[in-house]
Swiss-Prot record:
GO terms for cellular component: plasma membrane. This is Lysophospholipid transporter LplT. It is a multi-pass membrane protein. One of its GO terms (molecular function) is lysophospholipid:sodium symporter activity. Coiled coil: none annotated. NCBIfam families: PRK11195.1 (NF008397). Its main location: membrane. It comes from Salmonella arizonae (strain ATCC BAA-731 / CDC346-86 / RSK2980). The gene is lplT. Belongs to the major facilitator superfamily. LplT (TC 2.A.1.42) family. The keyword Zinc does not apply. Pfam families: MFS_1. It comes from the Bacteria. HAMAP family: MFS_LplT.
Length: 398
């Protein structure tokens, strides 16, 4: 997009729709690849505790590259950054198809994802602003969750048929995302001319961390989104091990169907948040966050498929309503202080550090033999208490 682009354009503009299509294909590949690679690990007789470790190497890339990816997103046209990042994902998926160690290939996908995230969210603030940004985030989350829904199911179903076919489908999805990125109009770089010295980049990133942490609103958003996504990723792996224990089902498809219900719910919750929550009323989302933990504990006690589907759908609705306003708040406030790209990179550091911690604790619980049901109950209760503490803290800071 040229310099004539102005913010606050329609969320159905050509630029916005191009971003959404590219995001859908990229997220589809991410989620199909996760379940296809988990099936590959199962087929190659890796131990159960290696499953969360697979995700840990992915989020480790986010943490390692966090000081750099925000500046990259703000120093170049964000659509082109997205295209380069999807190219890295394409290379990672293709390498797994060709027999490279799945942990190595998945790490490469993680590097691409780390570079992609600040650009995909930062570009929204360059295409629109204000309360339209909440709606744009809702559209982005809806697209992402639709991709999670379809990608997760496709990955599991195809893997039950043929693991390599599932991996090839992931590679093709990333290739489609690269092509879609070509149709994103070129925006002017948000912050060109920054230093590319390693020490200066690290110093600049941690200065951005300090600026965002000292602001009460952005600190609140960082903690809330970190807890949510850390819990969300852990729940995905918990479901994979919970299904054979609680339901007696051992295929690859059933966990993907159950995880897909969370995705459907997030679409609904994101839509509700776009209509009911503004940047001035973000605290309305907090009760939903507490209820997520309560419902996770209830879900862990189920032994029938139908109530499990219903409760995971409810978890998704609560999750979408909780996280979309927090994302929009950080983007709007962060854009004005440290730049949208840096704000999202700081957010990614927080989210992925939380994911790494939660996945590490979950992997440890699996290694020492804690039952899946007990793990789920404890996980849900702790999450509810954490969000309640965050809400109390935020009210005292106000």
């Amino acid at each position: 997009m040229s310099e004539s682009v102005h913010t606050n354009t329609s969320i159905c503009s050509k630029g916005m729709l191009s971003v959404i299509v590219a995001q859908f294909l990229s997220a589809f590949g991410d989620n199909a690849l996760l379940f296809a690679t988990l099936a590959l690990l199962k087929a190659q007789f890796y131990p159960d505790w290696s499953q969360p470790v697979l995700q840990m190497v992915f989020v480790g890339a986010y943490i390692l590259f966090a000081p750099f990816v925000g500046q990259i997103a703000d120093s170049f046209a964000k659509g082109r950054v997205m295209m380069f990042a999807n190219g890295l994902k394409l290379a990672g998926a293709a390498s797994i198809c060709l027999g490279v160690n799945p942990f190595v290939g998945y790490t490469l996908v993680g590097i691409g994802a780390a570079a992609y995230s600040p650009a995909k969210y930062g570009i929204l603030g360059e295409l629109t602003t204000g309360n339209k940004l909440v709606k744009a985030n809702g559209l982005m989350e809806a697209s992402t969750i639709a991709a999670i829904l379809l990608g997760s199911v496709a990955g599991g179903v195809l893997a039950d048929w043929h693991v390599i076919a599932a991996l090839v489908a992931c590679t093709l999805a990333y290739a489609g995302a690269v092509v879609a990125n070509l149709f994103i109009p070129k925006l002017v770089a948000a912050r060109p001319g920054q230093s590319w010295q390693l020490a200066a980049m690290i110093r600049s990133f941690f200065c951005a961390c300090v600026v965002l942490w000292r602001n009460g609103e952005t600190r609140f958003s960082l903690v809330g989104t970190g807890l949510f996504w850390g819990a969300g990723v852990t729940l995905r792996f918990l479901v994979v091990l919970w299904v054979p224990v609680a339901l007696g089902i051992t295929d690859n498809a059933t966990p993907t169907y159950l995880n897909a219900m969370v995705a459907v719910g997030i679409v609904v919750g994101a839509g509700a948040a776009a209509k009911l929550v503004t940047l001035e009323t973000v605290s309305r989302c907090m009760p939903a966050g507490i209820l997520i933990g309560v419902v996770v504990a209830m879900f862990s006690l189920q032994h029938a498929l139908l109530p499990a589907y219903a409760l995971l759908l409810l978890i998704g609705i609560l999750g979408g309503f909780f996280v979309v306003p927090l994302n929009a708040l950080l983007q709007e406030r962060g854009k004005k202080s440290v730049g949208a790209g840096n704000a999202i990179a700081v957010q990614n550091l927080g989210e992925n550090s939380t994911m790494l911690l939660m996945l590490g604790l979950y992997s440890l619980a699996v290694m020492v033999g804690v039952p899946a049901v007990a793990t789920g109950i404890g996980f849900g209760v702790l999450f509810a208490l954490a969000i309640a503490a965050l809400w109390i803290w935020q009210r005292r800071q106000a």
